[in-house]
Amino acid sequence: MQNKNDIITENTYCSPLHFNYMKSNGPTQNDDLVESMQQIESAILIGGWKKTKLWWELVSLMKSPSDYEIVRRLWLASPKSCRENLSVLRAVARAACISGEHMEGRTILRKAIIIAANKKRKQKSYLFKGKRYVKSMLKKSEMTKNQNTDSFEMHAKKALHDLNVVLEDFGVKTFLISGTLLGFVRDGAIISWDKDIDVGVFSEECTENIENLFSSLSNFNVRRLDLSSDRVRVTHETGVGIDIFPHYMEGGRRWHDGAATRWWNTPFSLKKMKFLGVDQWVPDNPELYLDENYGDWRVPEPNFDARLDAPNVEITDQDYFDSLIYFALLKTIVNDKQKMKHRYISLLRQLGETTWLSRI
């Protein structure tokens, strides 16, 4: 039986995280934003400490570095059980880093990395229960993976169509970029390990803030991805996330920004091609775009890191760039990517990290 605080928390801000609630009650003005953050803070304080979606929604509402104070205040007041929750740790670390508090963020990430490594060791110790069991689980995993890919492509087609309808009404064309363009050109499909869609827009076509274009729509939820760039993520009602990267001209090149890096391309125009059965804009010379972004893109490389490996990358925020290596290490441990794990450990050692890395 739920106690009173659990019921209040669930009714106050678990249902808000349902897509339809987020659209009907999402903040559009500064006063609404402050009120929304205060509502989430209250929901966490009365018992929602381990409800990770609350923490992530709070972080997604941050509009300036000063908003980190709410997250920090909650973190300092949180119980021990909350401080061992990997998703909460990652959310708080992200809030710290996007606010420029990198030392705080890295301290939290070190703890998260050690916890994740310990959990992974325990999971592996349970795995060795006989070859037949392991083989069976791997087969089931592959079947589920194929089913998930088919489902994602179906939802992605709908999400991309609806996105284009919205933006074309404002004279804005979306075009495939990054991993989505790579999958289209090389494989004729979405890359199997991609979990979202990447599109670009020309900044000169965006006469209005992209967030504002989606704020009143019932089938999309929109959030800025960080405080240092204009890129946004729109989440379709199907659950598909689409990252939108404005491409702007500077120094005779087209650039688009990430959190701590940016990438250049030779200026290009657009052409339409069939993607997932629908017409979609792509760079007029997609192979050149991919050459500049990936180098040898014709051979699949699951361990490619666009911040480290892209031939056209430029670091714009060294502190944040270094912090992202901690996030990357945490992700590789959770996903059991051994090759990349050792790569990020080596990079952290170059940054001066020593003793604690031996524990992972």
Spans of features found by a protein language model:
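Helical scaffold of the NTase/Pol beta-like nucleotidyltransferase catalytic core
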Residues: 83-94, 98, 102, 106-176
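Structural register within alpha-helical repeat arrays
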Residues: 23, 55-58, 92
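Residue-level signature for tetratricopeptide repeat
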Residues: 26, 60-61, 94-95, 331
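Alpha-helical adaptor scaffolds
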Residues: 49-79
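Alpha-helical junction/boundary sensor with strong preference for TPR arrays
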Residues: 47, 78-82, 115-119, 351
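Active-site nucleotide-donor binding segment shared across nucleotidyl transfer reactions
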Residues: 164-197, 204
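Conserved catalytic core of two-metal-ion nucleotidyltransferases
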Residues: 148-164, 168, 214-281, 288, ...
